[in-house]
């Protein structure tokens, strides 16, 4: 998830539940502690967020129950930037990346160019500043990718039916 959010947010738990209903295992966790999340600068420390995501990935890979499973990342806002940076570092070990209202630009041009996992960038059609950032990131990526705008949706996809469209696309 992204800045100012948590694993307990209704949007995050809803998407995780829908993915689980469709047979996709999920691990929903916070990239920052509560204290760290209070610091605005830390919320945008993409290198730190990426390190935390890579640590969680290593933990999953070390468990005999999960080590052989395909792994994908689903990130929102700054969490999407961390997902893309981590996917670039993990190369072919990540099967897919989904960004919901993400800030892929914060991953950096080099990382975006190194992502090999198929990537889905989902942006609200009324999230004007973020649309352009996703279009620019999309142009820098060399992997199989798709940018989808959800008509009428703002950054948090709070409008009726918009989050449901996100989960259908992600699954």
Could you tell me what each predicted segment is?
Residues 73-87:
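Glycine-rich nucleophile elbow surrounding the catalytic serine of serine-hydrolase chemistry
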Residues 128-133:
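Conserved alpha/beta-hydrolase "acid-adjacent" motif
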Residues 92-104:
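A conserved short beta-strand
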């Amino acid at each position: 998830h992204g800045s100012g959010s948590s694993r307990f947010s209704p949007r995050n738990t809803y998407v995780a539940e829908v993915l689980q209903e469709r047979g996709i295992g999920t691990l929903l966790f916070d990239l920052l502690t509560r204290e760290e999340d209070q610091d605005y600068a830390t919320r945008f420390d993409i290198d730190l967020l990426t390190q935390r995501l890579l640590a969680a990935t290593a933990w999953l890979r070390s468990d005999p129950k999960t080590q052989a499973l395909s792994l994908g990342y689903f990130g929102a806002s700054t969490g999407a930037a961390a997902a893309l940076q981590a996917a670039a570092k993990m190369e072919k070990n990540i099967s897919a990346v989904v960004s919901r209202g993400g800030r892929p630009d914060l991953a950096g041009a080099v990382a975006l160019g190194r992502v090999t996992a198929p990537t889905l960038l989902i942006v609200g059609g009324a999230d004007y500043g973020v649309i352009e950032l996703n279009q620019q990131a999309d142009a820098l990526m060399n992997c199989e990718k798709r940018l989808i705008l959800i008509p009428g949706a703002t950054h948090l996809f709070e409008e009726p039916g918009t989050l449901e469209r996100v989960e259908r696309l992600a699954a």
